[in-house]
């Protein structure tokens, strides 16, 4: 029956049975993996998704989404609509002053945001916290930008005292500052307003700094939380220059993708006309996945602000509840305020494998995304507590 189902799906272009069997095995493996996934910030609640008929088309958003191109099979209009949705979420009150695009991932957005900063300030040094995503120093290496990792607080935020000390040491040299809204391992939020206040106090005005926000996960969480402090809200009126987020994380697309929004003045600085495309070169990739654009568009407008707000509020509450449950075993557990990430000592290898936990430096975490079920949290809590009691008795 499964082979017949696959044959009906592929129709006249049916694949050999050997290949169909391999696809079915892959489908089964993925289904099982999704059911026990707890370690990475992927929202697996995709919803209805896109019509299968759209898979028949090569949809390529070439060049600048605001300029279009010679290629007619694009969805640039829907890309602009999706970006405008995000712009409003992040406080872009005059949309004409901002630019955005959808790319391969939040990492692509961070690389491009840092590139915009380098073009604005060619002699700048890139500053980031020790808890920043690995793609931030990678962006520096790719672009041959000098970078400096600053110490973090124990809960994973950028230490503002370390930032102030570094600015004194730099003696006025321009800086590109990468801040994080939801750090990779601990789900911490850098104090955006506090960091900008430190910059201002050191006489680093907008002409001597560029600030990028890596909001891969929580730039789609914090704006929806009514009790989140204004200082960690990724709103452009705080004074930063660009922000990126992932589509396959809180937004919930079935493929990796992401979005970048930046002040238009920075993009205008690097824009080049490309006659071959009848467009402008303003993006890192020349070809951008139109199917990813459609997936983000469907999620943003189909799910809507209200449901995203509910998802964020409920997920934060459930993460805090999970942390309390794990602490009942006597384990040390960190769950930052307004975070979906629950951090604990790395458990037994079988628990790591079963729940696909992300581990680093002796720590591991679970991330309570909207797609995580209560049953999965119950199973994980039981396994974690049994293992912790065993380790405690053995010690």
Language-model segments: what does each one mean?
Residues 183, 216, 224-338:
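Active-site C-terminal subdomain of aminotransferase-like
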Residues 189-227:
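Catalytic PLP-binding core of fold-type I/II PLP enzymes
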């Amino acid at each position: 029956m499964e082979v017949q189902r696959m044959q009906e799906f592929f129709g006249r272009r049916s694949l050999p049975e050997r290949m169909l069997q391999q696809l079915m095995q892959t489908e089964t493996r993925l289904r099982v993996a999704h059911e026990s996934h707890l370690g990475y910030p992927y929202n697996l609640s995709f919803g209805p998704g896109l019509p299968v008929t759209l898979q028949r088309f090569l949809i390529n958003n070439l060049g600048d989404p605001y300029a279009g191109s010679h290629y007619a099979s694009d969805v640039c209009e829907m890309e602009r609509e999706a970006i405008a949705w995000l712009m409003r979420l992040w406080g872009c009150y005059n949309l004409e002053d901002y630019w955005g695009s959808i790319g391969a991932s939040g990492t692509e957005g961070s690389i491009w945001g840092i590139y915009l900063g380098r073009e604005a300030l060619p002699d700048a040094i890139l500053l980031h916290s020790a808890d920043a995503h690995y793609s931030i120093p990678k962006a520096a290496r790719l672009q041959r930008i000098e970078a400096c990792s600053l110490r973090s607080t124990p809960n994973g935020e950028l230490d503002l005292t370390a930032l102030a000390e570094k600015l004194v040491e730099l003696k006025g040299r321009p800086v590109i500052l990468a801040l994080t809204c939801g750090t990779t391992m601990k789900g911490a939020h850098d104090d955006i307003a506090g960091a900008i206040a430190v910059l201002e106090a050191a006489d680093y005005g907008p002409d001597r700094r560029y600030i990028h926000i890596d909001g891969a996960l929580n730039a789609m969480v914090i704006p929806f939380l009514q009790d989140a402090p204004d200082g960690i809200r990724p709103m452009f009126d705080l004074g930063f220059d660009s922000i990126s987020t992932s589509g396959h994380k809180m937004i919930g697309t079935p493929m990796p993708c992401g979005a970048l929004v930046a002040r238009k003045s920075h993009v205008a600085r690097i824009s080049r006309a490309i006659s071959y495309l009848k467009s402008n070169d303003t993006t890192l990739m020349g070809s951008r996945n139109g199917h990813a654009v459609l997936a983000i568009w469907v999620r943003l407008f189909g799910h809507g602000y209200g449901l995203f707000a509910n998802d964020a509020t409920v997920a934060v509450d459930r993460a805090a509840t999970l942390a309390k449950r794990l602490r009942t075993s006597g384990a040390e557990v960190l769950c930052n305020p307004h975070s979906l990430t629950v951090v604990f000592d790395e458990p037994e290898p079988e628990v790591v494998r079963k729940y696909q936990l992300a581990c680093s430096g002796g720590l591991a975490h679970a991330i309570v995304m909207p797609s995580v079920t209560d049953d999965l949290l119950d199973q994980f809590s039981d396994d974690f507590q049994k293992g912790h009691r065993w380790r405690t008795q053995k010690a």
